[in-house]
């Protein structure tokens, strides 16, 4: 989670922090419309109010009436959709398609109980075709429900091949295979077969489902960031001749309402950031609250996590400036003092710091303690030790990177990745989210943030973040003179070309996704809410950093505009 940095002559630089790279300005909260995104049409968009004639009182009353009308309509649509999910006379495959559309439109959080009831109910597999079997498999695993991949064996012929002519079935199979777990050879073979056939179909002008196939091969459904996918699919779904008008209307109303909520959250974050005044005092620091907020929406797309997004965006914004101290400004002796002060975590430790470090230390100290107070107030839990441990771990990681650069020696590949997960901000983010959400927290699992190794679900997501970060910014790192990146270290240790190193890293990411898929279905030690956050971190990483050229800044700027400012 990293942002762009100013150019300064340095004694050393460390690897950048990954929760942070991008938006260069925010002169006003509401920006011009983003031309690459089609505005969402709705009978009554909640994110913009039409001009109303009359005095302020009349306008206020009219606006209130419109909002009440929209709210009533929304409640009606929610009830109608719930009834459709609960109807006994609807074929199972139609319910699966409905669930798939609901979740892709970004409104699945309204129907979690009804969706789980459908997915856990008996399903007749006698006449099931490949499309339906793969859809059912994907939906079950996506929602954390166990299902065996052996259901696909019956679709193989005597040569062990699937039907190459069934494009719809192969597309569904390919999407399902992306939820495979390590050791599931059936799904690995299915992915290889389906991907090869689907890629060949793209060269056939009259091939069916050309657009859907191209999208799936670019980024499979399971790997897409929820809110961006909701926006994209709302526009696509409305063009389908058989779309459900009520479902589309509900999705648009909800999207506009969530966008208005995000704008309100951004207003609070930017107000806090300006009052904090950190970058006013530290002119070298990056000023990126908008992008920090984008990451929180990627990790926590559900509206109910509003306060968690706000607190996490604050933490990431401060982390960004600390990264700049280590990466572009601080002298080695000062960094040693700062690291020691973070370990001590008291105000007395701040006294020995240089002036420019004191304000940053105080901002971190106060903001973290405020989060701890809110958790104590809301849940009765004392979590300072847990949060503090992840901050100390991260700052020590920055210090380690500084030593690598200052000493002129590159680390080993595994050493770099393991340290880079921490300096990427992954564990700090998970700790804040886990305790701020507060679901399923026990004494036993709360200790997972005070000792190493961290849980596999967190380290796998963090490794994906680090690997995608390095893939997306390798050119920038090389030009900046960084001693280490995953690409460079793969090339050095494995004697690979840059292209070969990138391919190896992509294979590594695939393997880590299999680990995450296993955690989604089989991890019983952590609540599903935090496991989903881990998968969302991996998704957001790919969305932000996956590109063929160094186009990070424009892409992140586009995402911010599309999600928060384009109606």
Swiss-Prot record:
Location of motif DDXXD motif in this chain is: 323-327
Q: What else is known?
A: Exclusively observed in the geraniol chemotype of this organism.
The lineage, from the top, is: Eukaryota, Viridiplantae, Streptophyta, Embryophyta, Tracheophyta
- Domain comment in the entry: The Asp-Asp-Xaa-Xaa-Asp/Glu (DDXXD/E) motif is important for the catalytic activity, presumably through binding to Mg(2+).
Residues where Mn(2+) 2 binds: 323, 327
The record's remark on the cofactor is: Binds 3 Mn(2+) ions per subunit.
Has UniProt tagged this entry with the keyword Metal-binding?
yes
Self-association state and partner proteins as the record states: Homodimer.
- Entry binding sites for (2E)-geranyl diphosphate: 286, 323, 327, 466, 469
Q: Which UniProt keywords apply?
A: Chloroplast, Hydrolase, Magnesium, Manganese, Metal-binding, Plastid, Transit peptide
From the Swiss-Prot or TrEMBL record, give the protein name: Geraniol synthase, chloroplastic
Q: Which GO terms describe its biological process?
A: diterpenoid biosynthetic process; geranyl diphosphate metabolic process
Cofactor entry:
Mn(2+)
Principal location listed in the UniProt entry: plastid
Entry's Gene Ontology cellular component terms: chloroplast
Binding-site residues, Mn(2+) 3: 469, 473, 477
According to its UniProt record, which reaction does this protein catalyse? Answer: (2E)-geranyl diphosphate + H2O = (2E)-geraniol + diphosphate
Q: How does activity depend on pH?
A: Optimum pH is 8.5.
Which terms does the record give in the GO molecular function aspect? hydrolase activity; magnesium ion binding; manganese ion binding; protein homodimerization activity; terpene synthase activity
């Amino acid at each position: 989670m990293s942002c762009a940095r100013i150019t300064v002559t340095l004694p050393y630089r460390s690897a950048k922090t990954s929760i942070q790279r991008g938006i260069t300005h925010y002169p006003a909260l509401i920006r011009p419309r983003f031309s690459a995104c089609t505005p969402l049409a709705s009978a009554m968009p909640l994110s913009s109010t039409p001009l109303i004639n009359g005095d302020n009182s009349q306008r206020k009353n009219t606006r209130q009436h419109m909002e009440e009308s929209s709210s009533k309509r929304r409640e009606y649509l929610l009830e109608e959709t719930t009834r459709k999910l609960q109807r006994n006379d609807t074929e199972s495959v139609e319910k699966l398609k409905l669930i798939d559309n609901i979740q892709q439109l970004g409104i699945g959080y309204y129907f979690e109980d009804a969706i789980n009831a459908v997915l856990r109910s008996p399903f007749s597999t006698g006449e099931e075709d490949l499309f339906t079997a793969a859809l059912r498999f994907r939906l079950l695993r996506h929602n954390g429900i166990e299902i065996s991949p052996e259901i696909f064996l019956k679709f193989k012929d005597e040569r062990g091949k699937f039907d190459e002519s069934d494009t719809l079935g192969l597309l569904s199979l390919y999407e399902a295979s992306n939820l495979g777990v390590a050791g599931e050879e059936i799904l690995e073979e299915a992915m290889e077969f389906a991907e090869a056939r689907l890629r060949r179909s793209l060269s056939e002008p009259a091939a069916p489902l050309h657009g859907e196939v191209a999208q799936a091969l670019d980024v499979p459904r399971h790997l897409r960031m929820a809110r961006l996918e909701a926006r994209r699919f709302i526009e696509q779904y409305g063009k389908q001749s058989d779309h459900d008008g009520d479902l589309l209307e509900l999705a648009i109303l909800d999207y506009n309402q969530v966008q208005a909520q995000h704008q309100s959250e951004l207003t609070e974050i930017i107000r806090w950031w300006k009052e904090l005044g950190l970058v006013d005092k530290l002119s070298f620091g990056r000023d990126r609250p908008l992008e920090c907020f984008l990451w929180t929406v990627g990790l926590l797309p559900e509206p109910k996590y509003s306060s968690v997004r706000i607190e996490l965006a604050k933490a990431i914004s401060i982390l960004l400036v600390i990264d700049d101290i280590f990466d572009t400004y601080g002298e080695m002796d000062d960094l040693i003092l700062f690291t020691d002060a973070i370990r001590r975590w008291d105000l007395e430790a701040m006294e020995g710091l240089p002036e420019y470090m004191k304000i940053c230390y105080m901002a971190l100290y106060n903001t973290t303690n405020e989060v701890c107070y809110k958790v104590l107030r809301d849940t009765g839990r004392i979590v300072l030790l847990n949060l503090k441990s992840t901050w100390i771990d991260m700052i020590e990681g920055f210090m380690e990177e500084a030593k690598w650069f200052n000493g002129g020696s590159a680390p080993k590949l595994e050493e770099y990745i393991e340290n880079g997960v921490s300096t990427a901000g992954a564990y700090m983010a998970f700790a804040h989210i886990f305790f701020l959400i507060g679901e399923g927290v026990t004494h036993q699992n709360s200790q997972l943030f005070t000792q190493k190794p961290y849980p596999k679900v967190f380290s796998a997501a963090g490794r994906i973040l680090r690997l995608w970060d390095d893939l997306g910014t390798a050119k920038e790192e090389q030009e900046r003179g960084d001693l280490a990146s995953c690409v460079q270290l793969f090339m050095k240790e494995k004697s690979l070309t840059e292209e070969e190193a990138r391919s190896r890293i992509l294979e590594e990411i695939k393997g880590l996704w299999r680990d995450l898929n296993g955690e989604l279905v089989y991890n019983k030690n952590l609540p599903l809410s935090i496991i989903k956050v881990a998968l969302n971190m991996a998704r957001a990483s790919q969305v932000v950093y996956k590109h063929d050229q160094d186009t990070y800044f424009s892409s992140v700027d586009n995402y911010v505009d599309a999600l928060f400012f384009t109606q």
